[in-house]
């Protein structure tokens, strides 16, 4: 999952405005860091779904260093409050917003329509837009292993 977050943030950098050719002749200015926000459905605890997303956020910071500045808003209920928080982050100038709960998909899509310059990544969502992408875990890998284990534990060597 960390690789996916780093890749998504790196891809977002490709969509950011590039300075004009005329400005290239001037002395190179320091590039402002990408502003990335993460919206969590629960507080960050020692383990669990939100903890893993926060580990991914930390990996992004480690990989990109001064090239990224992250913001976290935790314990955001799904629904109207989620839309308010996501909209507020977009208004603050966040360039990419990761929403880490299925219930954030619709609010993120509504906010994305009003902020086409902001990129959104909805985790476990399935609806996309020009500035909204989706990501998900590879659940099938764990399910496959559970099936193999179930078959090996059965008397017949078959699951089911």
What spans do the regions from the language model cover?
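Flexible loop/hinge segments that line or gate small-molecule binding clefts
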Residues: 113-136
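Short, well-structured alpha-helical segments in soluble
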Residues: 79-93
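Positively charged n-region of N-terminal signal peptides that target proteins for export
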Residues: 1-4
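Boundary at the C-terminal end of the N-terminal hydrophobic targeting segment
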Residues: 20-24
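Bacterial N-terminal signal peptides
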Residues: 7-17
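Periplasmic-binding protein-like
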Residues: 93-101, 121-123
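Extracytoplasmic "Venus flytrap"
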Residues: 35-56, 60, 71-82, 102
